Amino acid sequence: MERFRIKPYGFGELAQMYSPAHNYDSALQHFREEMHLTRGMWAAMVAEGYKENTKILTRAQVRTIVKFLGEP
């Protein structure tokens, strides 16, 4: 298996990496819920420029996600 790389990802692409057993829409919903429910994560993402309608996650945002959730 290829090692996870910190790079820009589509929001849905990364959501499916974290929830591979879910369909696309469920993975998106679960990923958003995790961002809100994980203490400090939402504020950290907003500080990195994340908005609710963000489609492409920057390297910095991906790094923040991995900091809070670990690698997918």
Please identify what each model-predicted range represents:
Residues 1-5, 9, 32-39:
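Membrane-targeting and insertion segments and their boundary/processing signals
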Residues 2-22:
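Polyanion-binding surface elements
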Residues 13, 30, 61:
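Ca2+-coordinating acidic residues in Ca2+-binding motifs
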Residues 21-56:
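Major-groove DNA-recognition helix of helix-turn-helix-type DNA-binding domains
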Residues 55-72:
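A short, Lys/Arg-enriched interface patch at domain edges and termini
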